[in-house]
Amino acid sequence: MDLSYLRSVSKFLTILGLIAVLLLAPAAHADEEPPADDGGNGEEASQIEDYASYEPQTTCHPKPRVGTRVLAEWLTSELGGGGGATGRACGGGASEHKDGRAIDWTLNATSQADRKIAKAFLKAVFATDEEGNTHALARRMGIMYVIWNDHMYSAWDEFERDGYLSSSCKSKRKCSKTLRHRDHMHISLSMAGAKGKTSWYEGRMD
């Protein structure tokens, strides 16, 4: 049997295992006690967030915000791929890259191994948790939308899979692999997620 195929399968199973651990294990240490003050609403501090609404760039913050960096570093260190949180100068059109809320996670859509990583990640973040919360991990991470391999998944549409074509392209055929997001996965966060203020970041901000 092809050894490269076996290695690919082994890596994919390892990734699935890591994601399963992430879904099942709380971020905070087990010996930490929950805060005594729940804000007066009888809800735990880690209550799941609602779906992120669309928040366009309105401020200039060209350096990635702390939550953006934490999520980007987790993606590359635990799941593979490259790239990460990316900032951009604030001139020109609007972009979440320009206010520190965007990740460009380097994955190659022509690579079977990278497609498996992307598929496993999307399956995990869009899964329903044990409490019945749909798209639970994406909501806890503060994911606003994802673009990957000619498709977009938006929180305000409950992460329905929609076709995507960059406004800079007349057709897929005339569109670059970067604008088609076939050489990276773009992840935009809500401002709360980018600042590390949603529940997934609890215990991960040290």
Predicted regions mapped to residue ranges:
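A short, structural micro-pattern
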Residues: 1-5, 99, 140, 179-183
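Catalytic micro-motifs at enzyme active sites that drive phosphoryl/nucleotidyl and oxygen chemistry
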Residues: 90-95, 170-177
